[in-house]
Amino acid sequence: MTERLADEDAKLVVLARAAMARAEAASAAAVRDVDGRTYAAAPVSLSALELTGLQAAVAAAASSGATGLEAAVLVAGSQDDPGLAAVRELAPLAAIIVTDRAGNPL
């Protein structure tokens, strides 16, 4: 049986899946900062810049002045996503949830 996510974490899944759909990407992520603001992103793949969705979401939060994160959701990503290190650098105790494409926690 799949564990039910808290409402605020489920919202992050919805935001990440929406970013994934908009970008027609294979994965995406969303984070919530300590003020409750959310940031969602899909991977960026330019010749001059490569970011995973989680790296892009953390970068958006940090560039918006976030001083910490409460949670991060990675949809259809891998457990070795380099964005996990970015989450831990900004917020060592933040909850990190990895899900499949449908948003079911792994």
Regions found by a protein language model. Name each.
Residues 33:
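Short, acidic, Ser/Thr-enriched surface-loop or helix-capping motifs
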Residues 28-29, 96:
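Generic short beta-strand
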Residues 46-60:
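A short, polar/charged loop-to-alpha-helix boundary motif
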Residues 23-27:
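Short, small/polar residue-rich loop motifs at catalytic or cofactor-binding pockets
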Residues 1-22, 64-106:
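C-terminal binding/interaction regions
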